[in-house]
Amino acid sequence: FEKLPVIVVSAFLDDGKLSAGGKYLIKLDVEGVEIEAIKGGARLLQGDSVLLCEEHGNDRHHTVSRYILEHTPLKLIVYDPRSNRLETVTELSILDRIKVSTHVGYNVFGTASAFWQDRISALNAARRAQ
């Protein structure tokens, strides 16, 4: 195995690579260490950021989504094919209905940002108008 450096996402704020006042979409693709990455990015996620990560279809416990709901201030959002909208997840049971295939990943979003929540609401409004 090759050793790879680990960088805490919030360190990008400390070294000036990211502005604390910026608006960010953070795509996590970290194959099994999503919770650790979310912990490492906690400071960045407090600002105008939205997190995009994959909820694996074979994870019937919804581990990443459960962590976001129970241990972070983030609102959890998922695309619901039944309503054709991005829905705020308040109970994990909606994921039981949405995650129908065990070999597919399902995107979930987490944000505490009014900026991103407004954009998601606008997307849903545009879908209703179609």
What are these regions (language model features)?
Residues 1-4, 15:
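A contiguous, well-structured "functional interface" segment within a domain
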